[in-house]
């Protein structure tokens, strides 16, 4: 025996405001199409005013006494709200954490290249995670790793601030630097 499931739209939509004949109140506080207060009128009168203007009657605040309704083009209103939400979403900046891996014996040339990449990450507004991995007997000389991370910290002082100070996690020494706030 197979069980049929109803197809449903999985998009999460905000609850729509009651419009026109779906408004259940008998009296409403009416706001005109251009924003002027018309006052408290019966629902029939409000629907007539909206119909004459060839617009919709939309319930703005249902919990007010009496409910507040506005005469507006509901389709245009939904479009504007969706457009504003998309604009706000587009303007959000996702902060990423970029990682650069060092070794206790990182040579000067490699150090400068990695430092240049760290400067670029911080300038772009991303956080930088610096990890220093120890192998084998290098674990006996953890102070070399600490010195290297202190050097990175001083070299990047003008670009960022230390968010997480160096700490050991297993065989790795980790540090996180956040970009400085732009004024």
From Swiss-Prot:
GO cellular component, one term: cytosol
The encoding gene: infC
UniProt keywords, alphabetically: Cytoplasm, Initiation factor, Protein biosynthesis
Subunit field text: Monomer.
Cited NCBIfam families: infC
Origin species: Pseudomonas entomophila (strain L48)
Pfam family, one: IF3_C
Function: IF-3 binds to the 30S ribosomal subunit and shifts the equilibrium between 70S ribosomes and their 50S and 30S subunits in favor of the free subunits, thus enhancing the availability of 30S subunits on which protein synthesis initiation begins.
Protein's name according to its UniProt entry: Translation initiation factor IF-3
First-listed, main subcellular location of the protein, grouped into a coarse class: cytoplasm
One GO BP annotation of this record: ribosome disassembly
């Amino acid at each position: 025996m197979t069980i049929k499931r109803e197809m449903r739209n999985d998009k999460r939509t905000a609850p729509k405001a009651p419009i026109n004949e779906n408004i259940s109140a008998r009296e409403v506080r009416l706001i005109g199409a251009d924003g002027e207060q018309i006052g408290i009128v019966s629902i029939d009168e409000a629907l007539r005013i909206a119909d004459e203007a060839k617009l919709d009657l939309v319930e703005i605040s249902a919990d007010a006494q009496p409910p507040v309704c506005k005469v507006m083009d509901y389709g245009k209103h939904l479009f504007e709200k969706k457009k504003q939400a998309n604009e706000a979403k587009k303007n959000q900046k996702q902060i990423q954490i970029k990682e650069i891996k060092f070794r206790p014996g990182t040579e000067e040339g490699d150090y400068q290249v990695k430092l240049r990449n760290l400067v670029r990450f911080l300038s772009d507004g991303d956080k930088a995670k610096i990890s220093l991995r120890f192998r084998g007997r290098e674990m006996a000389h953890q102070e070399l790793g600490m010195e290297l991370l202190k050097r990175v910290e001083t070299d990047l002082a003008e670009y960022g601030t230390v968010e997480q100070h160096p700490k050991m996690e297993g065989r790795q020494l980790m540090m996180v630097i956040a970009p400085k706030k732009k004024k």
